[in-house]
Amino acid sequence: MVFEPVINSHKIKFKLLDKMFSDFYFVSDRVNIFINLDSILSEFYREDLISSFMNLKGYENIALSSEIMNIAAHYRKYFYTRHKKTTFIYFYYMNKKPKKNMVIYPDYCKSIIERKNIKGKYEVFNNILKDNLRLLSLLSMYVPQVYFLLSDGYEPSLVPYNIMNNSICDNIVLTKDPYEYQFVSYPNTYVLRLKYDKSVLLNRKNLIDYILKDNKYKPNNYIDGIIYELILPYLSCKKRDLKGIKGKGKVNIIKKIDKLITNKKFPKFEDLSFNSLYKILDLDVDYDEIKSLYTITNISYQYNRLSKKDKINLEEFLIDRYENRTIMQINSTYYLNNPVQLIELWEGVQY
């Protein structure tokens, strides 16, 4: 089946998860897990898969929805069987252009938007995806504490941030998008960077080392990952089609920060703001240009500019129906070859 290899690559083996969470301090009995669907689905936009999608028959066309739901089953089972934690799982997806950010930066998320064009070369997959997302939305209504949320024209990362902002528990974001690495700056929040057996649980302590892993340069001083959300406006971000500031890449910026720390000219990381870092770095970058990039790259800044109505809209699809018979009937009728793992999805559920 064409969907399984990609989906299974996002299910980290329990053995590796055990290493990640062996000394993990949980702040409550609840864990929020946010799954960036665009990050996963981007792997299906490949020309070598087009013929495979065209050859799908019957119920094979809707197998993607059950495979995605089983990602939730995988992580729910892990956190309950290994750590006795109740999980709330949120799939989130960019269904509309992030208009506010595109006004400031017209090419923002351009590649994501173009590949979703129903009339383009990925027309077959987009039609399959449309049906599967509709089914995923339906399934999530009947599975306890699993939700499918749409961005509806907002920056997609605001969807998980809105929920994080209203709950005191551990938050784990499953993503491959460097834009979202900034989530490590927020309380009790971690990024699970998915990459088969090389997957990494990112936090404030290891983020800077991780983004420099392919570079020869290594800082002499500890650099807190909290800085990432402040330097992101300077950096390129392929996932969002952000070109960054020429000549001001991550190595150059972190080198400068490292030198300032050595010379005792750098403040506490917690005391930094966008403006103070801009002055300290003194990189000969136009303030208005970098500030405009900050307004579309900093998640907390964007969130603070939302109205109450906007925040309510972000929660529109938080629906629970809890009808066991309905979900069992759907499973036995449509997903015989790729069943939804219902037993795992009910692990540790609290009513």
Give the ranges of each region predicted by the language model:
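Non-catalytic, usually N-terminal nucleic-acid engagement modules in DNA/RNA processing proteins
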Residues: 1-113
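Extended two-metal-dependent nuclease catalytic cores across DNA- and RNA-processing enzymes
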Residues: 2-18, 85-86, 110-317, 321, ...
